[in-house]
Each structure stands twice: as structure tokens, then as C-alpha cells.
Amino acid sequence: MSERESWHKEIDLFLVAMGYFTRIPMPKWVEADSDKLNKASRYFGLVGLLVGLLSAIVFWLTQNWLPAGVSVLLAMLVGVLLTGGFHEDGLADTFDGFGGGWTAEDKLRIMKDSRLGSYGALALMLALLLKWQLLVELALYDPVVAGSALIVAHTVSRMVSASIIFSEKYVRDDETSKSKPLSQHQGINELLILIASGVLVLLFLKGLAALSLLLVMIGLRRLIIVIFRRQIGGYTGDTLGAAQQIAEIVCYFVLLVVGNIL
């Protein structure tokens, strides 16, 4: 394969990842199949970087003219519009399943139900409120830090979520599931590129903040995996969405705590 063909392949995989995780229209020549989607997992972090960057730009453009809370809300709205609430939906389904089911089979069945239950509604409401409050506090501390936090959290949280594919078992047998292609083994190349995207954005942060966030994310990933194994024996697309949302919130929390210490 020539260098030009290699670059074209990587661009194609990035666009496949962006088409899967966002509502941004893709060129007609971009075709996603199971193999491409599996390999495109290497670029899930970069998709988060794009979403976070656009959200941060909206925040930075409005924060001089609007109250911090409104600017943060607009930035969050941009993120939801770009992704279609894809990960938030996974969070709600996961909490409905984990909260309402007794056995792994019950939990998977409930998670498949498109209706929103009480556990999911509570999780979604609390997650959005937490993100808003943490970002407002970061904005009041320093608007530059708040915008950087959006970029970092959207990227790193997707790195944590997608890296679960590498070590864990996909537990759904439904061939029609949108996440079924992700059940294929994630190669070491996909994992390394994914990790590189997460580490790259840490350059937005000061040394102590970057190191603290990296260590917390490593521990959080392990904790999430333990919970998923105990609850359903592995992961599904919904639980990956939940992992992303949880990791994003923890990112904001860590950056706020470290910022106050500094």
C-alpha cells in the first residue's frame, strides 16, 4: 500500500468514526462496514476532540456577553446536538438495566427497551446537572480553563470508554445491534492510537493537573470494568456510553479540585 493510499485509508476510518458518533453529515463516498467500524475505534478520541473543541469555541465566544451558566449551557447543547445525545442515551439505558434487573439477562433485556425508566431518568438528570455545575465553577475560576476542560474531558472520556473494547467481552448476541461491530477484538494499533489522542490533549493542562487526571482515569477505567463484569459479565454499546459520561464528569471534577489546590 502506497503512502497516499495509507493516508486515504486513515482519513476514511476517521470519517467512519465521526459518522458513527456524531450527526455531522459525511461524504457519500464514506462507507461503513463492520470491519471499518471496528478499526475506526482508534479515532474515537479524536471525535471527542472535535466535539469538545466546537463546544469550547461556543463557550469562549459567548462567555464575555452572557452569564457563565448560560454560556456553559450553550456549550453543553452544542455537544448534545453534535452527538445526538448518543452517550447520554447509553447512560440512561445502563442505569435502567443495572437498577431494575436482578440477573444479567434481565439487565440486558431492560437496557434494550427504548423506554426511559426512573433509574435512567434520575441518572440523566443528575449527570447533566453535575456537568453544568462543575463547568460553571470552572468558568468562574478561569474561562480559559473551562474551555480547555471541555476539550480534554470530551477526548479523554472517549479514550477511557473505547479502551474497554480492548480487554473486555461484548455480551450481546443481537446481530442487529448498532454496536455489534465493536464486539470484534480491538487491535494493539487501535489501542495505541486511541491512547495517543488522549495523552495529546493533556498538553492543554498544567503538569500536576495532567498527571492527576491521567492517574484518576486509569483507576476509573479499572473500577468501571469491575462494575460491568459484576453486573453483566462484560460490556455493551450502552455501557460504553455510560462509561464515557461518567469519565467526562470525573474529568471536570478532577480539574476543578486540582485548580483549587493550585
UniProtKB/Swiss-Prot annotation:
Pathway: Cofactor biosynthesis; adenosylcobalamin biosynthesis; adenosylcobalamin from cob(II)yrinate a,c-diamide: step 7/7. It is found in: Cell inner membrane. It holds the Pfam family CobS. The keyword Secreted does not apply. The chain crosses the membrane at residues 43-63, 66-86, 120-140, 146-166, 191-211, 242-262. Its EC number is 2.7.8.26. InterPro entries: CobS. It is a multi-pass membrane protein. Keywords: Cell inner membrane, Cell membrane, Cobalamin biosynthesis, Magnesium, Membrane, Transferase, Transmembrane, Transmembrane helix. Its cofactor is Mg(2+). One of its GO terms (biological process) is cobalamin biosynthetic process. It catalyses: alpha-ribazole + adenosylcob(III)inamide-GDP = adenosylcob(III)alamin + GMP + H(+); alpha-ribazole 5'-phosphate + adenosylcob(III)inamide-GDP = adenosylcob(III)alamin 5'-phosphate + GMP + H(+). It comes from the Bacteria. GO terms for molecular function: adenosylcobinamide-GDP ribazoletransferase activity; cobalamin 5'-phosphate synthase activity. GO terms for cellular component: plasma membrane. Joins adenosylcobinamide-GDP and alpha-ribazole to generate adenosylcobalamin (Ado-cobalamin). Also synthesizes adenosylcobalamin 5'-phosphate from adenosylcobinamide-GDP and alpha-ribazole 5'-phosphate. Belongs to the CobS family. PANTHER family: ADENOSYLCOBINAMIDE-GDP RIBAZOLETRANSFERASE. This is Adenosylcobinamide-GDP ribazoletransferase. It comes from Shewanella baltica (strain OS155 / ATCC BAA-1091). The lineage of its organism: Bacteria, Pseudomonadati, Pseudomonadota, Gammaproteobacteria, Alteromonadales.
